[in-house]
Amino acid sequence: MYFDAKGLTSDFDIVGLPSSDLLVYLLRTLYYETENNMYRFILASQSPRRKELLKNIGAEFEVIVSDADESAVSGDGITPGLYVRELALIKAAATAKKVLKDKKAVIIAADTIVTLDGKILGKPKDDNSAREMLSSLSGRKHEVYTGYCVMRVKDGYTVCKSVKTDVYFKELTQEKINAYIATGEPSDKAGAYGIQGIGGLLVEKIDGDYANVVGLPVSALADTLESEFDINIL
């Protein structure tokens, strides 16, 4: 391969690309690599599910776990969407304090909750708590909200959004509930189930973004990065 005096490739094909397409491909690849060097993603979460979701879309990132005091945010008197956005914001802000000198840092923080009849269902305290939650969800529709914030450290520019997904549970017998609790999966999950694991067998259908239920609406996140920060994942 060579470039002529005008910077154009010679007329030949390589891996099925005509020369004009090859030039465009090379330039776009160079731009993408250069653009990637302009920022560094930091995920302010230790959630293995969020890490996996980001990896699945090809995003390169490192994890710096937030030490924010989530009890400082009360869900009383505000909508679930606002509540998760505020939780994500304090996580992002707490993590930003750790990397203030890193002007390439772009922080991604998120929080997910389950609501039923306007009541927030957090992580179960024990097996009995998980049993109560799963019994209340049986045969009914509930909502999963994930709030996320993207914060650019160099100037503090921050965008926070939330996404809602409706989840419909099957009718669950006590035997099924007990069997699911025995797997240990509900213990660290909001609403006492994980849709990406065995808990997916409890779900009849969903209306909305599946990844949002897992813990991070990556499609909406990618749109925010592109429209608000001029960062393209794809």
Set out the residue ranges of the language-model regions.
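GST superfamily/GST-like fold recognition
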Residues: 38-59, 140, 155-157, 164-234
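N-terminal polybasic phosphate/anion-binding patch
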Residues: 32-106, 119-120, 172, 182, ...
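Anionic-ligand binding region
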Residues: 133-134, 147-152, 156-159, 164
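Residue-level signal for inorganic ion chemistry
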Residues: 54, 88, 111, 130, ...
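Compositionally biased, intrinsically disordered low-complexity segments enriched in Pro/Arg/Gln/His
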Residues: 26-28
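Extreme N-terminal basic, low-complexity initiation segments
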Residues: 1-12
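Active-site-adjacent loop/tail segments of enzyme domains
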Residues: 83, 112-142, 171
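Short beta-strand and adjoining strand-loop segment in the mid-core
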Residues: 119-122, 149, 162-170
